[in-house]
Structure formats: structure tokens, C-alpha cells
A protein has these predicted regions:
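A structural detector for beta-sheet-dominated domains
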Residues: 13-15, 33-35, 45-47, 70, ...
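Short, well-ordered strand-loop elements centered on a beta-strand within folded domains, enriched
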Residues: 25-31, 53-57, 96-104
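Short linear motifs at secondary-structure transitions and domain/linker junctions
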Residues: 1-9, 19-22, 62-66, 73-76, ...
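OB-fold ssDNA-binding interfaces and closely related basic DNA-contact patches used
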Residues: 1-45
Length: 114
């Protein structure tokens, strides 16, 4: 089963009172909520590095996917979501789910860059 949703907007949440020092509390310290238009498609929760992450999950009835990443992936994930033209949230199995991009051509050098 392959489920894929195009993502065109996000909302971010960061908690001020949660420790980012590690440990296995299982409590997320940041979250990114993913949308296709006005439809909520799921979230990515970020946990302190070293936390044992839960596997991804899917709720087919609601059309939502839940992902769990290490906090060290937070900046690159936000960068990908803000800067890639085409981003999709996908779920294939409990061991294969995440974000992916579409084809993005390399920039053509301008005369100034030569």
C-alpha cells in the first residue's frame, strides 16, 4: 500500500518547557503540522536525539500520517518544506514513511555567475 499526500503548507509548534537534552522521555519538543490546502494531513514530531522513536503510523479513515524524527533533523526538515517546490508526505509501511520531493531541476548558471 502506498499512500501519498502533496503538502503545500505547514504550521509549526515548539514547546518552551520541554528538555532537549536527550533522555528517553518520549515527549516531543517540536512539531510540524502538514496540510494539503485546508486539509490536515498529519504531523512530524521531533524528539531529543537518543530517544527511541515510535514507528510511523497512518489513519486511512482520516487521511493522516504521523511521523517521528530526531531533533537533529528539525532544521533540515523545515528547510526542505520551505524551499522545495514539490513535497509529499508518504506512507508505504511502518518501516517506510516520510517526506519526499518531486523533480527539481538544477539552476542554470547566469551570465553573472560565469
Amino acid at each position: 500500500m502506498i499512500v501519498e499526500y502533496p503538502i503545500d503548507s505547514i504550521a509549526v509548534r515548539q514547546w518552551s518547557s520541554r528538555s532537549t537534552n536527550g533522555g528517553s522521555t518520549g515527549v516531543a519538543v517540536a512539531g510540524v503540522y502538514l496540510f494539503e490546502g485546508e486539509t490536515y494531513r498529519g504531523y512530524i514530531y521531533f524528539y531529543p536525539d537518543g530517544t527511541e522513536l515510535r514507528p510511523p503510523a497512518i489513519n486511512l479513515a482520516q487521511g493522516q500520517i504521523q511521523l517521528h524524527f530526531n531533533l537533529s533533523q528539525y532544521n533540515s526538515t523545515l528547510d526542505l518544506l520551505h524551499n522545495e517546490g514539490v513535497v509529499a508526505l508518504y506512507y508505504t509501511s511502518s518501516t517506510d514513511a516520510g517526506l519526499k520531493t518531486g523533480k527539481d531541476p538544477f539552476a542554470t548558471p547566469t551570465q553573472d555567475a560565469v
